[in-house]
Amino acid sequence: MVRHHQPRKGSVAFSPRKRAAKETPRIKSWPQNDEPKLLGLAGYKVGMTHALVTDSDKNSPTNGMDVFTPVTVLEVPPVVVMGIRAYEKTSRGLKVITEVLADNLDEELSRKISLPKEYNKSEAIAKIQGVLDKTEDIKVLVHTNPKVTSVPKKKPDIFECGIGGANPEEKLNTALELLGNEVKASDILNEGQFVDAIATTKGKGFQGVVKRWGIRIQYGKAVRAGKGRHVGSIGPWTPSRTMWTVAQAGQMGYHKRTEFNKKILKIASADEVDQINPDGGFVKYGLVKNDYVLVKGSLPGPSKRLVILRQPIRPNNKSEDMPQINYISTKSKQGV
């Protein structure tokens, strides 16, 4: 007799499937890196196109050939390091001791947070240096500049970013050098390297169990009665309650997701936007005006969504050779 085996439909790894708390993702884990630089960067998703890239994998049957490759375009205007935070280790995890803010902050930040009217930067730096002996980690506050892009908003996005260094003292010295300055994608990323992409996915609203969990559509009498797209049984008589693992209708999409080891194919400056802008601009975005990054494959979220690129926290052993791009499609994406 054939052994009957059917794994459950859908993964419970991401339960509860509810809306993300905020659109700008919060990153709790950063890789250990001794290089004195930021460990992450933010950009805005523009859209997708395709390119012909020479396959450099020696074990691939298409080695040395031009391969059709889908790519995602991210517009990455320079981000600004607006603050420094010192953390101490407590019995309940890391806790902020103190922080330093930069001078001459962008006036658009007042749309997002309350800025201090009177602030003594020198005293704040002296305070953070005074608690360095009990500091466990140093991180920086970074904000974006959406007003220079085609994203229709002026309010900056603020996120906390890890910084490289062997110890808190090295991290603090690097952070003080970067405080108040702009950081470009070319300063911290390289072509051919792998990064982690973190973003909030595209929202789908309230969906049924078939689309949300992928359960089988019932047949026969159930379909004729108009009940084909529902769960046949939501549990036994005892225990007299519904388990949380049972597939039910509800919110789908708009979740925080991380995609590991996405390859960067190209990092270009604002002078090279003609090589990527299609006829009529990208659908639901417009034209790229600043530095941009081409990432192999797809990324979470719709166009205009903030995507944070992080240094890989679980790097793979694949080659990080310089990609050779022979063609990038700039044909109109209207009606595609």
UniProtKB/Swiss-Prot annotation:
Task: Show the GO cellular component annotation of the record.
Answer: cytosolic large ribosomal subunit
Keyword Ribosomal protein, does the record have it? yes
InterPro entries reported for this sequence: L3_arc_euk (IPR045077), Ribosomal_L3_dom_3_arc_sf (IPR044892), Ribosomal_uL3 (IPR000597), Ribosomal_uL3_arc (IPR019928), Ribosomal_uL3_CS (IPR019926), Transl_B-barrel_sf (IPR009000)
Q: Which domain of life is it from?
A: Archaea
Q: Which GO terms describe its biological process?
A: translation
What molecular functions are annotated in GO for this chain?
Answer: rRNA binding; structural constituent of ribosome
Q: Which UniProt keywords apply?
A: Ribonucleoprotein, Ribosomal protein, RNA-binding, rRNA-binding
Q: Where is this region: Disordered?
A: 1-34
Tell me, how does this one assemble? Answer: Part of the 50S ribosomal subunit. Forms a cluster with proteins L14 and L24e.
Q: What does this protein do?
A: One of the primary rRNA binding proteins, it binds directly near the 3'-end of the 23S rRNA, where it nucleates assembly of the 50S subunit.
Question: Belongs to which family?
Answer: Belongs to the universal ribosomal protein uL3 family.
The record's NCBIfam families line, in alphabetical order, gives: L3_arch, PRK04231.1
Q: What is this protein called?
A: Large ribosomal subunit protein uL3
